[in-house]
Each structure stands twice: as C-alpha cells, then as structure tokens.
Amino acid sequence: MRAFSEAYLRRTRAGMWADSRDALADLELASRERILDVGCGSGELTRVLAEESSGTVIGCDVDRSLLEYTRGSTENDIEASSKPSVSVVQGDATRLPFATDSVDLLTCQALLINLPDPVTAVEEFVRVSSDLVAAIEPDNGAVTIDSTVPQEATLEHRARNAYLEGVETDVTLGVSARDVFETAGLDVLSTHRYDHDRTISPPYDEHALTVARRKATGAGLADDRATMLQSDLTGAEYDDLRSEWRAMGRDVIEAMQDGRYERTETVPFYVTVGRVQP
C-alpha cells in the first residue's frame, strides 16, 4: 500500500465536500448509529461524517501519526458542539480490529486505489458492516487541467498517462468500484459522481509558489520518474518530457509574476454505496 504524509493528504483533499454533500445522500448519515472510516488518513472525510451524523464515528488507519493528527483536528472541530468526539483506532484495512457486524456504515475515501488487492479489503468491510459500505474513490485517468499556460494541460496529460501505465495499483478504480463491490458480495445500491476542483489563482500562497518552482526545476516530475519508466516511456522520452516540463514551469513562474496564472485541476470521485447481503 502506498503511504502519504498528513500535509499531502490535507492539501489534496482541501475543500472536498465544502461545496456540496449531495453525493453522500445514499449513505443515510443522519440515521447511522456507528460509522467506521477506514484509511481515514488526516481525517477529512471523518470530520464530514461527524458533522452529518449524531452517531459514533471511528477513524481507522494503519499510520499512527496520521491518527494523532485526526484525533486532534476532529476534537478541535467539534468541541464546541454537543456531538461526541471522534475516536481513532490503528488497523490494517484488510485485517480490521473490529468484530463482525460491529458498525452499520463503513466508509473509505481514496483508499482502494492504493491497495494491490481492493477486493480483499472490501470483503473485510463486508464482514465488519451490518448494513452499508461506501467507497469514495477517484478516477485519476479522467483528471482534467484548465490552465492559462497552454502547454501545461498537454504535458500533464502525457505525464499522467505514463504514470498510470507504470503504477502498481489501479488509480482509476473510482469509475469501476461497482465491479469490486459486486465481486466482494455487496448489492450495489448507487454510484454518484463528485468533482473535486483544486484551483490556483492570485494571490498565490507559498504552496503554489513551491509547486511552480518544482515544475521549473523538474523536481516534481522526477518524484514519479521510476514509476513512469515502468510504462512504455523510454529514458530518452522521459528526458524530452522533463525538458518541456521545465520550460512550462518557467512559463508558469513568469505568469505568476504578472498575476496572470490560473489553474483548475478537476478530479472526478465516485461514491459507490453497497448493502451487505443478509
């Protein structure tokens, strides 16, 4: 399973569910008594669940440091309300430390795309949940870029395709999560799409400036070099892409200096809800 830092998770999930929670309607959060959020990471979805439900909410992750962050952030968010605090438990998604039928809703967000065997995890979810299982997973193959630097979208598309071919897990799983659910024995109730927009516009924060600098130096692309070279991309083709990538990064920095740079990345997520068969 791929691991991510708390800062990365917060940054990439910032703003999710702030605009609309309609895609979560079939989770029936208001009526849930006990919810388990598996692979909770830094707790972005966990906090939404706690806000929308009066029941018990538990965050579970294999990374203890992420759990400590989630515990602290959720306590700060709801301490002024009458809702109970969110509890956290360390555990592996494929071997959950929970009894059979111990929750009535089990959720995960951007977890299955990082697992080599998502079906095994969902089978474990079926064991632990007495009623519903919901997976909120992206289709990273359908990400779109709208940028004021014309070549940025094209170059990111080329880099993403190479990464998708080289990565060892199915990072496009969101669009086909229904198949995983059915294989694991769930009755699929619904699938709803939710588009998560990540926007950069003036005034630029420090993170946006850092990303631009990493484009110009090629450092951002280099982070994924090994994975990209597991695809059909040759070393020479990677070097050509990196050269174009760095030139694009310099154009981004120039546009930022004039306050002309704007970019929106849209990541489609799919909320798949299934019911445990009696």
Cite the ranges covered by each PLM segment.
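Class I SAM-dependent methyltransferase Rossmann-like catalytic core
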Residues: 1-17
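Conserved alpha-helix/loop element of class I SAM-dependent methyltransferases that forms part
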Residues: 14-31
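Class I SAM-dependent methyltransferase SAM/SAH-binding core
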Residues: 36, 41-95
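A conserved beta-strand element that flanks and buttresses the S-adenosyl-L-methionine
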Residues: 107
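A short His-aromatic
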Residues: 110-114
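A short glycine-rich, Lys/Arg-flanked "PGG" loop and its adjoining helix->strand segment in the class I
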Residues: 119-134
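Conserved catalytic/acceptor-binding region of the Class I
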Residues: 134-215
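Conserved Class I S-adenosyl-L-methionine
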Residues: 187-278
